[in-house]
């Protein structure tokens, strides 16, 4: 869907995130979206298990769909570094049987970086359900939400000069709130002042 001032909401793209190329589908559509400086729409696609690029003229291509020859789980959210690299989370939510799905090829849930040329790097595999992702204004810290009811946290990772991540730390935890209120850590954004706006139980 899209929203335009004076016009409101209208259909933008259908299908979105699932072309039927992969025979399954739980939460099959696109999830995280971002618009890059060139006006291209990048999408984390649960259904087709990839990061895609939609060009202003309507053309579309895959930026990343595997790591070392194994299909990604179901990319969930993404953010752009000023270098042009895309950082994204890859939980199992798009797979019908989640972590136990027979189509799952990776034995972990990762946070990845993909360069404009399509080179994919695993940044961390320590998170069980990585979800929302965003940089601090100076790009020295990467924040990642974890939507695991048994460990509902936000992590903060230092970003090294080469774009990889240092040892992360737990920024906040709301596990005690899970079950008492609806919701989990999910999407997040960081404003220009460095404030983190995040979904949570509530």
Label the model's feature ranges.
Residues 1-202:
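Sequence-structural signature of mature extracellular/luminal beta-sheet repeat domains
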């Amino acid at each position: 869907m899209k929203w335009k001032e004076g016009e409101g909401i209208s259909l933008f793209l259908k299908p979105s995130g699932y072309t039927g190329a992969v025979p399954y589908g739980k939460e099959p559509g696109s999830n995280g979206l971002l618009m890059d400086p060139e006006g291209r729409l990048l999408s984390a696609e649960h259904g087709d298990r990839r990061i895609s690029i939609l060009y202003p003229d309507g053309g579309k291509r895959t930026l990343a769909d595997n790591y070392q020859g194994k299909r990604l789980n179901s990319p969930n959210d993404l953010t752009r570094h000023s270098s042009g690299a895309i950082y994204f989370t890859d939980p199992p939510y798009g797979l019908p049987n989640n972590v136990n799905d027979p189509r799952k090829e990776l034995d972990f849930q990762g946070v990845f970086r993909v360069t404009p040329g399509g080179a994919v790097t695993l940044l961390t595999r320590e998170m069980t359900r990585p979800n929302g992702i965003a940089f601090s204004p100076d790009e020295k810290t990467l924040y990642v939400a974890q939507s695991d009811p048994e460990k509902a946290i936000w992590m903060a990772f230092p970003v090294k000069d080469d774009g990889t991540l240092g040892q992360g730390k737990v920024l906040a935890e709301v596990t005690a709130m899970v079950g008492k209120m609806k919701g989990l850590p999910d999407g997040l954004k960081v404003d220009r002042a460095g404030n983190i706006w995040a979904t949570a139980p509530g």
